[in-house]
From Swiss-Prot:
Enzyme Commission code(s) on record: 2.8.1.10
Gene encoding the protein: thiG
A GO molecular function held by the record: thiazole synthase activity
Listed HAMAP family: ThiG
Domain of life: Bacteria
Lineage of source species: Bacteria, Pseudomonadati, Chlorobiota, Chlorobiia, Chlorobiales
Compartments (UniProt record): Cytoplasm
Protein name stated in the entry: Thiazole synthase
Pfam families membership: ThiG (PF05690)
Length: 259
């Protein structure tokens, strides 16, 4: 599979995995390995960076093997998100940030005015910003024009497992922006990953679909193959959809059969 390039950095895998809600750290590590991912996202506000306890997933993640992408999960204002990003940069030594600014704790949809405000501030502070946003082409174009390194529209609400609910918006976004387009949230199973790539997205970020699967490692393996299949399919070029049938066998020089 061709490489995913974000802000000049190359990744052989086009999958990004989250690190929360796994049964235990061992299952998490096995699932990450099975998925083939090279980038994992960690929620800065939900971990004790100074702790050496078993609950601190940072002690299990090899930063030489995985590119750590901190996120601002749990932030509801631009101010909270900016402060969290600065904490992540200080603690992890990275200026990359997956920017999340939520509107409420029920839908977990992004608060777009606060998101745009936070993105602008972080870009001024020399962060590499990857914003979680809704599947609105206008918002994604604004984020792209501001200088974000990628846009990450939701496929469906976070953790819903509903899959790609609005493929047409994703196609419009794909046509309107030149930076990487990464589906973030809503993926439920391997077929959702394949569909996303067939729509032309550059990457897929998922967490719950793997972490909460009955067999997380097996699901991680499935999404790895789904990503490969979806990306290969879109590069291969599918046939156009048509209302009427077209015979797959040629009709020229057919043997005449007397009735």
């Amino acid at each position: 599979m061709d490489e995913l390039i974000i802000a000049g950095k190359s990744f052989k895998s086009r999958l990004i995995l989250g690190t929360s809600r796994y049964p235990n750290p061992q299952v998490m590590m096995e699932a990450l390995e099975a998925s083939g991912t090279e980038m994992v996202t960690v929620a800065i506000r939900r971990m004790d960076l100074k702790s050496d306890s078993a609950e601190n997933i940072m002690k299990f993640l090899d930063d030489k093997k995985y590119f750590l992408l901190p996120n601002t999960a749990g932030c509801y204002t631009a101010k909270e998100a900016v402060l969290t990003a600065e904490l992540a940069r200080e603690a992890l030594g990275t200026n990359w940030i997956k920017l999340e600014v939520l509107g409420d704790d029920e839908t977990l949809f992004p608060d777009i005015p606060e998101l745009l405000k936070a993105a602008e501030t972080l870009l001024e502070k020399d962060f590499v910003v990857l914003p979680y946003t809704n599947d609105d082409p206008i918002t994604c174009k604004k984020l792209s024009d501001m200088g974000c390194a990628a846009v990450m529209p939701l496929g469906a609400p976070i953790g819903s497992g509903m899959g790609i609910r609005n493929p047409y918006n994703l196609q419009i976004i794909r046509e309107q922006i030149d930076i990487p387009l990464i589906v973030d949230a809503g993926v439920g199973t391997a077929s959702d990953v394949a569909v996303a790539f067939e729509l032309g997205v550059d990457g897929v970020l998922l967490n719950t679909a793997v972490a909460q699967a009955k067999h997380p490692v097996q699901m991680a393996t499935a999404i790895k193959h789904a990503a490969l299949a979806g990306r290969m399919a879109v590069n291969a070029g599918r046939i156009p959809k048509k209302l009427y049938a077209t015979a797959s066998s040629p009709t020229d020089d057919m043997i005449e059969i007397d009735g």
